[in-house]
Structures are given as structure tokens and as C-alpha cells.
Design a protein with these regions (language model features):
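Glycine-rich, mobile lid/loop segments that gate access to catalytic sites or pores
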Residues: 9, 69, 76-261, 391, ...
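N-terminal, positively charged regions that mediate nucleic acid binding
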Residues: 3-43, 428, 434
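Structured core elements
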Residues: 43, 54, 95, 125, ...
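Internal helix-turn-beta structural module
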Residues: 49, 320-322, 329-437
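Short amphipathic alpha-helical face segments that pack within enzyme cores
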Residues: 24-28, 142, 146, 302-309
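Conserved phosphate/anionic-ligand binding catalytic regions in large, soluble enzymes, centered on
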Residues: 11-13, 17-22, 117-134, 259-285, ...
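Short, charge-patterned binding micro-sites
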Residues: 43-61, 331-335
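C-terminal catalytic subdomain
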Residues: 273-275, 280-324, 335-342
Length: 437
């Protein structure tokens, strides 16, 4: 009999999506505080709407940050540089309502001995990994991200599809094999992108006809320019995901028709509203806490990064094909209250034949120091590395080192720091030893 596959879908949004504009401003402000004072405590929320950015939050820091300047730089960098967009970096208003962190919170978090620093809040955090892509991420999400990354490259090059504006979304549905849970092929791709009004009514063209011609042109360009470039990009990187995009997928482009009004003028953006795009595209689980604008004393962020690091290293070490890790914390307490592991009954090596998920979790607790200060140290989370995480996902990126400007003792200097350190596979050997693999 023919086995039917099942369908799973993930979405992504571009750096020009209003919620992502907010995330990037929040993280850029966090980075600016950390550049001047690595011990800054920051919780920064941003709202973007027509012609206006509002930044609010709690900060405890020795540093002064030019909030207006940072927000404008981010907005211009994303590409909101024209008055037509009704939101641009040079003319929008920027209101800052940042005030000091509550001493009640501070006393529970800051300790004499740094390694005993308590968690900044209670909460649950999840980390997930699977072996269906070389990033140890769901294929649906990786493809959704890559489509929009390539669209942004095309927009910035300005050679083809010159009508592109910064706001866009993608969605990818993949058919999986019911027996093996492996991805078989891309079933549906949705691309919605903001664009200039590049065909105007007049000269015998009605408004409806002009709109239809624009839509046909954009659809054709996505089919013949964007998707082939996405495939080529994956092939250049030696990525097998390219093989999933065959000729018979369904393509929807700007299904409502015209998409000229967009960005923060079309929809108000808020920090922390794209938490599934930021993580695993609907796979695994999510504790509900957003990442952007929070310094690493907030376990919402640092412990979610640590949980991803554990899950990814467990899968890479061959413990299971798919792993979910949950950590929980209480405010002011350093050690996690619980560690939970779910291997989804996925195949595991003979050496682990009788081992329960509970036993795996107990061993993880022994292998990894999950106190907030230890996590911060392991991944260098006091460095200004967060703006890079605020678009196209916090996970599934390659770790890299780069020189950044920081201030030490009132003097600006360059320091090499690591980005996406939680994606390193540096615990695989320890895990294999522990589990005798």
C-alpha cells in the first residue's frame, strides 16, 4: 500500500517586519549598554508605528546610551529610508521612556559571589534539536528563513526585483514520511512581500488591471528569480535541503494582491511577538518568554540558549534523533528547579537501549553547570552580540568570531568576541563519554 506522508509548516518574517524592527531596536540598545558596561541589567521593549518609535523598559547600568541614535541607525540599516514608507529612520519620532530597574528585583539577582547569582525571574525554557538538517533544526523553518534572507540580498543588490520594500513573510510546508519522519519534498511555499507601486493606472489601464499586472510580475519573479537563487544558495553551501524543492510545489505570492502599505505603517510592531520564528518554527515547545531586549541575567534568554546547546549536542552525539530539553528556574535561586528531557521515542543507539528519558535528564544535570552565571560565562553573554540574533532566528546559525568595539575604563578598544556560541558542538565528546557511545 502507498504510505501517505504528513504535512508540517513553519513561517518566518524578514528584518523589515514591524515586530522584527522592534526586536532589532531592543537588542541594539541592549548591545550598546553592554558595549559600555558589561554588567548592565536591561529589559527593553520597543513599539513601532506610523512615524513613531517608543522605547520603554528598566535598566541598571553605568552607561549612557543614545537611544534615538541607535533606533535610527537600525531603522536605516534595515532599509526604511524613504518618506513614501511613512516610517523612515531619519524623520520618525523616537520617544524613550527607559527608567531604572527595581531594587527589589536587583537584590534577588545580584550576589556577592558571582557564580551564585540567582535567576532573574521564574519561568520555564525549552531547547530543541533534530537531525533532519545539518543545523539540527526543522527543515520547514530553515527554508522559511533562507527564502527571506535571499530576498533581502536581492533587495539590497538592487539589480532585479527593484520594487522590493523591506517587509516580507514566508511560509514553507513540507511533506514528511510517516514511517521515518524524514522530509520528502516541499509541498507549498508562501511568499508575501511589500513592494513599490511600480505599475500605475492610467493610459487605458484600470486600477484593477494595474494591480493584476504588478501581482503577476512579482509572482513570476519569485518563481523564476527568488526560488532558483534559494536553491543555488543551498547547493553552494552543499546543503541537501535544495533537493526538497522539486518542480511540483504549490506557490502562493502576495495572495491578497497589492502589498504596498507595509512595515510599521501597515501594522504596529512590538518586541517579543515573533517567538516561534525566533526558535523552532512550532516544533519542540516554547516557555513563552521572548528573548530580545533582555540581558543574560534574564533566564528567559540565557537558559533557552543553554537548553538549545544541550539538545543540539545530545542529537549530534547520537543519543537520539530528536530531543527536547526543559529547564525551570525561580527568581533569586541559582540552580534550575528541574531538568526534563524528551527524546520523542526516536531511535537511539544500542548502548542506551534501556535508558529512560529521566535518566538522560539526571546525567545532563551532572554534565552541565546550569546556574545563570555559568551559562553567561560559557557563551560570553556579557558581550554585545545580540543584535545579530534579532532577525532570522536565534538558533541554527553557525558560530563565528568577530572584532567589536567596546569601552574599557573609559577608552574605546576592539575586542574579538564569539557570536552564537550556544550553537557550538563542544560537548559532544563529554556526552559520548558519559553515555558510553
Amino acid at each position: 500500500r502507498i504510505t501517505m506522508g504528513f504535512l508540517f509548516t513553519s513561517e518566518s518574517v524578514s528584518e523589515g517586519h514591524p515586530d522584527k524592527v522592534s526586536d532589532q531596536i531592543s537588542d541594539a540598545i541592549l548591545d550598546e549598554f553592554l558595549r559600555h558596561d558589561p554588567n548592565s541589567k536591561v529589559a527593553c521593549e520597543t513599539l513601532c508605528t506610523t512615524g513613531l518609535v517608543v522605547v520603554a523598559g528598566e535598566v541598571r547600568s553605568e552607561a549612557y546610551v543614545d537611544v534615538q541614535g541607535v533606533a535610527r541607525r537600525v531603522i536605516n540599516q534595515i532599509g526604511y529610508t524613504k518618506g513614501d514608507y511613512r516610517f523612515d529612520g531619519n524623520s520618525c519620532g523616537v520617544v524613550s521612556a527607559i527608567h531604572e530597574q527595581s531594587p527589589d528585583i536587583n537584590q534577588g539577582v545580584v550576589r556577592e559571589a558571582e557564580e551564585e547569582q540567582g535567576a532573574g525571574d521564574q519561568g520555564i525554557m525549552f531547547g530543541y534539536a533534530c537531525n533532519e538538517t545539518r543545523e539540527f533544526m526543522p527543515a520547514t523553518l530553515i527554508l522559511s528563513h533562507v527564502i527571506l534572507k535571499e530576498l533581502a540580498v536581492i533587495r539590497r543588490e538592487g539589480k532585479v526585483m527593484t520594487y522590493l520594500r523591506p517587509d516580507s513573510k514566508s511560509q514553507v510546508t513540507i511533506e514528511y514520511d510517516e514511517q521515518t519522519n524524514r522530509p520528502l519534498r516541499v509541498h507549498t511555499i508562501v511568499v508575501s512581500t511589500q513592494h513599490d507601486e511600480f505599475i500605475l493606472p492610467g493610459n487605458g489601464l484600470t486600477e484593477k488591471e494595474a494591480e493584476q499586472q504588478m501581482q503577476e510580475r512579482i509572482r513570476e519573479d519569485v518563481r523564476t528569480i527568488l526560488i532558483p537563487r534559494v536553491k543555488a544558495r543551498l547547493e553552494r553551501a552543499g546543503d541537501k535541503l535544495a533537493d526538497l524543492i522539486t518542480g511540483d510545489y504549490i506557490l502562493h505570492v502576495n495572495p491578497t494582491g497589492k502589498f504596498v502599505i507595509g512595515g510599521p505603517h501597515g501594522d504596529t510592531g512590538l518586541t517579543g511577538r515573533k517567538i516561534i520564528v525566533d526558535t523552532y518554527g512550532g516544533r519542540g515547545a516554547h516557555g513563552g518568554g521572548a528573548f530580545s531586549g533582555k540581558d543574560s541575567s534574564k533566564v528567559d534568554r540565557s537558559a533557552a540558549y543553554a537548553a538549545r546547546h544541550i539538545a543540539k549536542n545530545l542529537v549530534a552525539a547520537g543519543v537520539a534523533d530528536e530531543v527536547l530539553v526543559e529547564l525551570s528556574y525561580a527568581i533569586g535561586i541559582a540552580q534550575p528547579l528541574s531538568i526534563y528531557v524528551d527524546t520523542y521515542r526516536s531511535p537511539r543507539p544500542a548502548a542506551l537501549a534501556g535508558m529512560t528519558d529521566g535518566e538522560i535528564a539526571r546525567r545532563i544535570g551532572k554534565l552541565f553547570d546550569l546556574r545563570p552565571a555559568a551559562i553567561v560565562k560559557r557563551f560570553g553573554l556579557k558581550n554585545p552580540i545580540f543584535e545579530a540574533t534579532a532577525s532570522y532566528g536565534h538558533f541554527g546559525n553557525r558560530p563565528y568570531r568577530k572584532s567589536v568595539k567596546v569601552w574599557e575604563h573609559g577608552v574605546e578598544t576592539e575586542r574579538e568576541v564569539e557570536f552564537f556560541g550556544w550553537e557550538k558542538l563542544d560537548a559532544v565528546d563529554d556526552i559520548r563519554r558519559e553515555f558510553e557511545l
